[in-house]
């Protein structure tokens, strides 16, 4: 039996390799392995918890310099005194807010998820982006189409 989904995943993985984006390639290869093995029974759990776990891992990576001491407290304090750092703080707040709207939109309008995923994979693979795009993209879409 011909598996169109597997073919799409292989194509996206190839796109990841061609564009030298190991994040996309490895992620898709892991999903292919899950799909073609008995691990496929975990897909409902991955679909339900994967985003939360990914955000936790991303947050750990972002907070690691503070926890390790690489980013000293004095630097954090000075970030409130430099205009560029204040801009970075404001942008961080806005992007976090957009991500929150994105999570809501993805839950309430699942028909938009496919477009967001394709756009994110293309952005990661072709433009060396990072796969945090679906949440922010969904947040931007929510500003245009509404949360509903």
From Swiss-Prot:
It holds the Pfam family DUF441. It is a multi-pass membrane protein. The chain crosses the membrane at residues 14-34, 51-71, 86-106, 121-141. It is found in: Cell membrane. Keywords: Cell membrane, Membrane, Transmembrane, Transmembrane helix. GO terms for cellular component: plasma membrane. The keyword Transmembrane helix applies. The keyword Translocase does not apply. Belongs to the UPF0756 family. This is UPF0756 membrane protein YeaL. The lineage of its organism: Bacteria, Pseudomonadati, Pseudomonadota, Gammaproteobacteria, Enterobacterales.
